[in-house]
Amino acid sequence: MDAAQRQLSDQIDQATQRLIDVARVITEPDLRAPSLLPGWTRAHVLAHLARGADAMRNLLIEARTGHNRPAYASAEARDAGIEAGAGRTPSDLTTDLADSAMAFRTVARQLPDDAWRVPVRVLNSRPFPAHQLLTRRLVEVELHHCDLGTGYSPGDWPTAFAAMKLDKPMRSQREDRLKNAASVQAPKLRPPRPPAPWNPNQRLPGSWLGTR
């Protein structure tokens, strides 16, 4: 992991901490309430973020080993995973979100330099180098945190993310959130006390790296 990749990984850590701080105080009614994404509750958004981390970890492992390990078995399996996760309790869903984020981070931090250049793909997308997974994960966390509708908005984005140069699909998605922000009024969910930190330096059992 070079300096630029480590900086991206650090930004993902910080974005994940902000997300988990909010996830920890979401109540059952809050979780079942609609998100800002049509047809999805807040639980769906959090489940999507957890499964997204697993999918990107799969691709990092594929880049490292050379063995086929698809992000998702199929589009249907992806959707089914989100639906299953959305039915979990707030505590279980937050744990799932934190565990999947930690597992992705661990594999990314240990990835050999040459593996970052290996082409990977998500379902039927065009191949792209594995190093782009870091940017994709950061964008996914920041944008979907806004989609929760808990008060986090583009105005809360760190300057580095707001100014980051992105390829067109991700750039357009970020612009969409900026355009929609003015019309969205959502109450901020605040932790009732200082939240316990998400510890990105915690070591995971080795079996988590390749079997979750």
Where are these regions (language model features)?
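Short, extreme N-terminal leader segments that mark the start of a protein/domain
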Residues: 1-21
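Structured surface interface patches that mediate subunit assembly and partner/cofactor docking
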Residues: 1-7, 61-71, 95, 110-212
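Short amphipathic alpha-helical segments with heptad-repeat character
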Residues: 9, 13, 46, 50, ...
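Aromatic- and histidine-enriched alpha-helix N-cap/loop-to-helix transition segments
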Residues: 14, 37-40, 44-51, 136-139
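Structural signal for well-ordered, non-membrane alpha-helices
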Residues: 16-20, 24, 53-57, 98-112, ...
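Helix-loop segments that flank and shape redox-cofactor active sites
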Residues: 21-41, 110-126
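Conserved alpha-helical segments that form or flank metal/cofactor-binding pockets of metalloenzymes
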Residues: 46-75
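A short, structured beta-strand-centered segment in the mid-to-C-terminal lobe
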Residues: 78-100
